[in-house]
C-alpha cells in the first residue's frame, strides 16, 4: 500500500485509503499468475467503488474479481467457513474494525492456515515493526474478534 503511496484514490491516496484495492491486487496476482498492482486494481473503475469518508465499497471485490477473471467471490461472516476455505487454498479478504490490525477500518488478506489452525495474514499496511507477514494469528481471538465480513475467492 505504501509502495504506491502518492497515487490518488478516493479523497486521498492509495497509502491512506487503498487497503481494499491493494488487498485485491495481492489476491488477483495470486489467482491469475500475473502481477496486478494496486494501480491496476483501481485504474479500471476509478473512484466508482469508493465512498468518501468511509472507504472502498464491499461490492468492489466481486466487481474487481469479474473484471480480472478471478472467479466467484463468496461473502460471509462465518469464521468456520473462512477456516475451511483457507485450508482448501482459497484466499480471503477480511474487513476489520478497530483492534489489532487498525485504529479505524481496514482490509487485510488471509492467505492461509497452518497445520495448527493459525491464520497467515498479508496486511497492505504491514511494516517491519509489526511484521505480520511472519506471524500466525488465532482466528477467533485475533482475526474474527474485529472482523466485519470476509470475501472468499474461488481458486481457478
Predicted regions and their residues:
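Loop/turn elements at helix/coil->beta-strand transitions in domains of secreted/extracellular proteins
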Residues: 68-72, 88-92, 115-118, 145-148
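Extracytoplasmic/secreted envelope proteins and their assembly/folding machinery
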Residues: 20-28, 38-42, 58-65, 79, ...
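Noncatalytic regulatory segments and standalone regulatory/sensor domains
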Residues: 113-156
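Catalytic nucleophile-His microenvironment captured as a short glycine-rich beta-strand/loop
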Residues: 19, 91-126
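Mid-length scaffold segments of soluble, non-membrane domains
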Residues: 36, 43-74
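Alpha-helical scaffold elements lining the catalytic groove of polysaccharide deacetylases
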Residues: 77, 85-88
Amino acid at each position: 500500500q505504501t509502495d504506491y503511496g502518492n497515487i490518488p484514490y478516493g479523497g486521498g491516496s492509495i497509502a491512506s485509503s487503498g487497503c481494499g484495492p491493494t488487498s485485491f491486487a495481492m489476491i488477483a496476482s495470486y489467482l491469475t499468475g500475473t502481477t496486478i498492482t494496486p494501480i491496476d486494481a483501481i485504474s479500471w473503475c476509478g473512484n466508482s467503488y469508493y465512498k468518501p469518508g468511509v472507504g472502498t465499497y464491499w461490492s468492489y471485490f466481486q466487481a474487481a474479481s469479474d473484471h480480472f477473471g478471478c472467479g466467484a467471490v463468496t461473502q460471509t461472516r462465518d469464521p468456520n467457513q473462512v477456516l475451511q476455505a483457507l485450508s482448501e487454498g482459497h484466499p480471503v479478504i477480511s474487513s476489520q474494525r478497530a483492534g489489532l490490525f487498525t485504529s479505524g477500518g481496514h482490509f487485510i488478506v488471509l492467505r492461509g492456515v497452518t497445520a495448527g489452525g493459525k491464520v497467515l495474514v498479508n496486511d497492505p499496511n504491514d511494516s517491519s515493526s509489526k511484521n505480520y507477514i511472519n506471524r500466525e494469528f488465532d482466528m477467533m481471538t485475533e482475526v474474527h474478534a474485529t472482523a466485519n465480513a470476509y470475501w472468499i475467492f474461488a481458486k481457478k
